Regions:
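Helicase motor core with emphasis on the C-terminal RecA-like subdomain
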Residues: 2-274, 279-329
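Long C-terminal interaction/binding lobes of large macromolecular proteins
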Residues: 187, 206-208, 216-236, 246-250, ...
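A conserved acidic, glycine/proline-rich C-terminal tail/linker
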Residues: 360-379
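Short beta-strand-centered aromatic/proline hotspots
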Residues: 385-392
Length: 704
């Protein structure tokens, strides 16, 4: 709306802007776009008031400043509710806990317990963490209770909007006893009829757990009820960490993005569409936002030059989007106007193909990368229905209903959510309590068998310790390092270690990671001691080495694809004539290579590299982890068999090489072998501990 000249009259008498769920925008480019839009509105209507609402944010002062901006003339207040919303959290503990857990079966072993909980309430939301899991859980529940057909539904972001709207209204009307969903129902709709929420698998963050719990009992004076169903044993620790954080009001902070130039390039064109402006007018308005409060003059000049000349792309007319006429910036080309208005926004995703019945309505969307692998006759799940692919034509996957078992399950990007830093600290504290044999809540008492075995065969690290395990067998040499900092940090640590080792020793090293640690695996001996690990995990030349270790050029190229879309350098096409992902990738690569060759100092290239470090690799958390490790005592244990800590990493290593069914069969076989080894341990647990200390402690190193 702000790109049209009529907006000046439309918003002139606006009095109030209310931004709901501000925490969901803060720290994302959608939030940056909101800040810029609010700055534009404040220019049009100087007396407008801004309100922000949030129930789950840790850094409330920062949220305030980013919302009201830098030029607020009136005082700004934070209003806190004095009503304490109670959250009743119930943990469903498995009847038998695997002492060798793995994160591959998405908790379906708890299906009976989930169905029993659904039966105990009038209306339930069953949250999973990914769209893929939502499809599988919906089918599993329906197979177990076919009489619930028509009474349960599915909801996620890749379903057709009309289907999602129908499900939301059916919840409000009390027509459904359960809905299996993802974060698509975290926000936006109030469901007073919902009695309880079931969370399958760890939410990976305290704020997300509170947000989802709040979907139940959504009326004044009512408490929220959340039932937590762990997908594997270690997630019980994550729940206790989250429960403790909630009781202590420790909610994750949202890290703000500082002055992204792709958003500013887009905004410069949007402003020029509505009304010609001078440079100083543009600079003052942009600097009134919190994100761009320190925008340098040279960066502003670069943005305005880029939208007028295209920089090194000046030979191409499409990049001359804004004209400078008598000191004013304006858009005079109608083709530019149409193309830009269709591209406004900061939400980017993989190219989606619509899924539609041959004779009937639309079902939803799958990513092009998944659709490209489908063959005629392939069966897949979407929207809780089993579909058979007939053909793909003109950007649409045409299907018919079918029966049997799926031969493919759609997978969408963004499936792995890393453990938040606050929750990771809580996990380490509980593991420390277990190591010190302190009194534990009942939920963690259920893990005693698993943890006793970890202590017997290896070690349980305390807060000031770093555990390293090593296992050599006929398949190769495996080294496990446990940081308990989340998947993103584990990926960074693993890549850094493998890169630095490979510079000094010739060896083929593969990496496996999870939220708790990493595994380096080599067919030949890795030959690493604690002193070498401490050396390789120093912060010396950290940024250069981490970029080199992860093929920084390719990572930057992928990140640049999103930046180029937001900045308007590539276009997804027009309605009915969308471009394929292959075409967009080729276009992005051409622009990227041209800038690298002819304009290596281009600020959008710099932004892409910076986002790879800060967002994808979370280098700030990586630095904090390395600092903590430098100050810790290192414990090195040579293993005779896989431990409860190392077993999930072993599963991650072989997962990509084996199909799901074959993987489950192989994992169960290895679990049985390890359980037999446990049962044959000679003597009592006390005697075994003495033997372990006598043998294992001889192979333990500490910091030199």
């Amino acid at each position: 709306m702000l790109s049209y000249p009529e907006s000046l009259e439309t918003f002139k008498h606006l009095r109030t802007v209310i931004v709901d769920e501000w925490h969901e925008l803060l720290g994302s480019k959608r939030g940056i776009q909101t800040e810029l839009a609010l700055a534009r509105i404040s220019r049009i209507a100087p007396t407008v008031r801004r309100w922000g609402l949030s129930a789950t944010i840790g850094n409330i002062d920062h949220a305030k400043y980013s919302l009201v901006g830098q030029s607020a003339s009136a005082p700004c207040s934070i209003i806190r509710s004095d009503q304490q919303r109670l959250i009743d959290i119930e943990l469903v503990i498995p009847q038998a806990i695997d002492r060798f857990p793995w994160a591959g079966h998405i908790g379906l072993v708890m299906l009976k317990e989930v169905i029993a909980k659904i039966e105990s309430a009038n209306s339930t939301l069953v949250f999973t963490n990914t769209r893929n899991q939502t499809e599988l859980w919906y089918q599993a529940i329906l197979r177990a209770r076919p009489d619930w057909a028509g009474q349960i539904a599915i909801h996620h972001g890749s379903l057709a909007p009309e289907l999602r709207t129908w499900v939301e209204q059916a919840i409000v009307d009390g027509k459904l006893i359960a809905v299996v969903c993802t974060s698509s129902l975290d926000l936006g709709v109030d469901f007073a009829p919902v009695d309880q929420v079931i969370q399958v698998g760890s939410p990976k963050g305290t704020a997300r757990l509170i947000q989802r719990a709040g979907r139940s009992g959504h009326s004044p004076g009512r408490s929220s009820k959340l039932v937590f169903v762990p997908a594997h044993a270690f997630e019980i620790i994550e729940l206790e960490a989250a429960r403790q954080a909630i009781s202590q009001k420790q909610i994750e902070q949202r890290r703000a993005i500082d002055a992204p130039l792709d958003c500013l390039v887009q905004h410069a064109v949007t402003m020029a569409l509505a009304k010609p402006y001078a440079k100083q007018e543009f600079l003052e308005e942009v600097r009134s936002t919190y994100a761009y409060r320190n925008l340098a003059d040279e960066h502003c000049d670069w943005v305005l030059d880029f939208v007028t000349t295209g920089g090194c792309l000046h030979a191409y007319k499409d990049f001359h989007r804004v004209a400078l006429d008598f000191g004013k910036y304006a858009v005079i080309d109608q083709a530019v106007s149409r193309r830009h208005r269709m591209s406004i926004g900061t939400i980017t995703s993989d190219m989606m193909l619509q899924v539609q019945y041959l004779k009937g309505g639309k079902i939803g969307f799958v990513e092009e990368s998944f659709a490209a692998k489908l063959k005629e006759g392939d069966k897949f799940l979407l929207g809780g229905k089993l579909l058979e692919m007939v053909w793909i034509r003109e950007g649409t996957v045409w299907v018919r209903k079918t029966k049997g078992d799926p031969t493919a399950v759609p997978r969408w990007l963004g499936g792995n959510m890393p453990l938040s830093s606050e929750l990771a600290l809580g996990v380490r504290r509980w593991i420390d309590a277990i190591a010190r044999k302190e009194p534990l809540p009942d939920s963690l008492q259920a893990l005693c068998g698993l943890m006793d075995l970890q202590r017997l065969w290896s070690h349980i690290p305390r807060l000031d310790e770093v555990l390293v395990e090593r296992l050599t067998n006929r398949e190769g040499d495996a080294l496990m390092l446990y940081g308990f900092e989340g998947r993103s940090v584990s990926e960074g640590l693993g890549a850094l270690l493998a890169y630095r080792i490979s510079k000094e020793r010739k060896n083929t090293i593969s990496i496996a990671v999870n939220d708790y640690g990493l595994m380096l695996y080599a067919p030949d001996s890795i030959g690493i001691d604690t002193k070498s690990l401490v050396h390789w995990l120093s912060q010396r030349e950290l940024q250069a080495d981490i970029l080199s270790s992860l093929n920084a050029t390719e990572l930057t190229r992928r990140r640049f694809r999103d930046i180029a879309r937001i900045a308007g350098l590539i276009h997804s096409g027009t309605p009915g004539q969308s471009k394929s992902m292959r075409h967009l990738q080729a276009s992005t690569s051409m622009v990227f290579d041209a800038l690298k060759q002819y304009d290596p100092a281009n600020l959008l290239l710099w932004q892409a590299s910076d986002e790879v470090l800060s967002d994808q690799l979370q280098i700030h958390r990586l630095k904090e982890t390395l600092t903590r490790m430098e100050e810790s005592r290192w414990v090195h244990v040579d293993l005779k068999q896989w431990t409860p800590f190392s077993f999930p990493l072993m599963v991650e290593r072989i997962r990509d090489r084996i199909g799901n069914e074959s993987l489950a069969q192989r994992i169960r076989k290895i679990q049985n072998q390890l359980e037999q080894g446990t049962a044959s341990e000679s003597g009592s647990l006390t005697k075994s501990k003495r033997n372990a200390e006598k043998g294992n402690m001889q192979s333990r190193d500490t910091n030199p």
